[in-house]
Amino acid sequence: CLVGSEMCIRDRADTIVDDDSFDQADFLRKVAAYPECPKSACPSPEVYQRGFEADAEHLYAVTLSAELSGSYNSAELGKSLTLEEHPDKKIHVFNSKSASIGETLIALKIQECEEAGMEFEQVVETVDAYIESQHTYFVLENLETLRKNGRLSRVKALVASALKVKPVMGATPEGTICQLDQARGINKALVKMVDYVKEGENNSSDKILAISHCNCPERAQMVKEALLERMQVKDVIILDTAGVSSMYANDGGIIVAM
């Protein structure tokens, strides 16, 4: 059983829960309208604890990278609270060391292992190895969220915007964000990202290509086609970004994981 716990996004006027009711278009309008950046809040340990009380033999949670969010530590505490009352439960919290579509791929890997009839410990070992082999890349159209969060100075954001410089970003093995490259214009940045994806995958035919996009399905399709021209994959998934991913990717952002 995969335990779901929704993060919240708060701005001056609203609290938005990142769940199935999330309205991406409405959220993007609100983000564009407010000068201040919305803030995200991870689920409390008690929220995870309630999820871990599900009647299932094996329980798993997949969290946003521990280097980017308090979700992993919160889930681990929720696990400890649950095991105090139910010491026989089998629970594992996976630190995705990724975000967005990367977490989706990990959840699918867990499902695959469970459907194959693996023992709990074997599932954990297999999925941990999968996480270590996974790569995440992204390109942002809009740098305003990074600027509003204090991760990019106003001057740098304005210069980047004026010069149409788009960073090509990735996740480190530890789950932090790094800049891999940059390019003048979004299309050139996406081409560079495709290059990095191709160079980073040796056995792509056994992997799922996963792409999430923030309000730019045509751009996601273009990235998919560019990658499939250069590599074979087992399957392709394209999804809209959810709440927290939309907050950081911002309108026009593209995330790729394999």
Give residue ranges: language-model regions.
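Active-site histidine-anchored catalytic micro-motif
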Residues: 70-136
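Gly/Ser/Thr-rich loops at beta-strand to alpha-helix junctions
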Residues: 65-73, 98-101, 216-218, 246
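Short glycine-rich or small-residue beta-strand-to-loop segments that form or flank ligand, phosphate
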Residues: 58-65, 92-95, 109, 208-212
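Single conserved hydrophobic/aromatic residue that forms the stacking wall/gate
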Residues: 1-4, 8-9
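Class I S-adenosyl-L-methionine
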Residues: 14-75, 80-84
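Gly/His-enriched, cation/cofactor- and phosphate-binding structural elements
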Residues: 176-258
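Internal, active-site/partner-interface "lid" segment
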Residues: 112-179
